[in-house]
Amino acid sequence: MILNNDVKLIPGSKVEAVIRISKKFVKSKYNEILQDYSSRLKVKGFRIGKVPFSIIEGKYSDNIRALTIEKLIHKSLEEFFKSATYKPLGYAVPKILDEKLEIDFSKDFEFTVVYEAYPEFELPDISNVEVEIPEVFVSDSDVEEELKLLQLENAIVVEDSGDVKSGSIVRVDFVELDDSLSEILTTKRQDFVFTVGESNNYYGFDNDIIGMKKDEEKIVEKNYGMDYKFSELANSFKRLKISLKDIKRRDIPKLDDDFAKDIKDSFNTLEDLKEHIRENMLRLVKERSESLKLSKLLSDIAEKLNIEIPSSMFEAEFKNVLNEFSHQNKINLEQLSNSSTGLEGINDVFKENVLKKLKSKLIFQKIVDNDLTEVTDSDLEDELVKQAEDAKMKLADIKKFYQEKNLLEILKDEIKRQKVKDKILKNVKEINPKKVAFRDFINYKTGE
């Protein structure tokens, strides 16, 4: 069908292709559509399927030609992209440049298409790369802190007949009062539950209710400073009526061997649990170190390369980042829409982070594509066995799932990516310029 195509790269990581289709194929496609019209048209004086082509062409020539052009473009692009050196991105629809296309049966049909492709770039040598990663130490205090968190997670909330203390879980009703001590109904709140000393309640009356007992009522007067956390209350006076309806406390379990056994049957002593916590922390350090090492490596490579990110790829990734930011911070996207249109006017921090992230993704994918590592049947079997064990499923059921969903090739690709990642990390030299504590390391930044 396609006689030939002229392809060239143009700025913006775009590809321009001139595609020529043989006039013989154009005529056959036209006749095919004409025949289809003939088989369905009802024309007075003729049976269906017996209408002369000349009559059909006289009435529907423009429609048939337009449909022929549409079919030719669709079919030829499908064929072209299958063997194209520069594959199109899935973020944007290819654009036909020709404003008006017409069929001339005496000539080959030609049109020009422009589409965005993965950017072209050459990878530098990464065989002797050095990456700075801090040396991390897990101390006994880190383990004890984690143990206390586990202790709190397993605490039982029970009724407390005493008075309110810091850490008490209380349920209150409250309302603002005016100068005549009448309730301002628009400020009334009922059954408000919070932990005293750990909340961020609007009026900040945690300390004011310490010592109160269940069913007690109290009027509290509050003067808020200029720097109060909620600006609408800053430099103001409020009078509140607070009714204490319920007091509860956390019954925290004792840290002993029985506590360890309650966490997991395989733990016989508290020391077993502590060792398990330490092992988990060390595993987390290893995973985080590897992630930082790869991130830093890709970031360093990206700084040396001029990679032109396609606009559609940027927009898609930016939208994902924006949605994540909106979800985490509970901000409506409409509030940010004015600053999220294209590359212009976007918050510089967001823009820079998205570009860095995309460059790192593209570099890693290029490394994977260039790597000759193969995924064997044994590799695939090992991964399926591991997933079956982790999910507590039968191996046959895991295999059936991947086969029915046609996901085996995707799984193979993931296995290869992990193999390549392991190979990269093995060859990268790690420099430890400083030591950091476990807690600090969790939020450690490499500067990428």
UniProtKB/Swiss-Prot annotation:
Residues 167-253 form the PPIase FKBP-type domain. GO terms for molecular function: peptidyl-prolyl cis-trans isomerase activity; protein folding chaperone; ribosome binding. It catalyses: [protein]-peptidylproline (omega=180) = [protein]-peptidylproline (omega=0). The keyword Chaperone applies. Keywords: Cell cycle, Cell division, Chaperone, Cytoplasm, Isomerase, Rotamase. One of its GO terms (cellular component) is cytoplasm. Pfam families: Trigger_C, Trigger_N. Its EC number is 5.2.1.8. Gene3D superfamilies: 3.10.50.40, Trigger factor ribosome-binding domain, Trigger factor, C-terminal domain. One of its GO terms (biological process) is cell division. It comes from the Bacteria. Belongs to the FKBP-type PPIase family. Tig subfamily. This is Trigger factor.
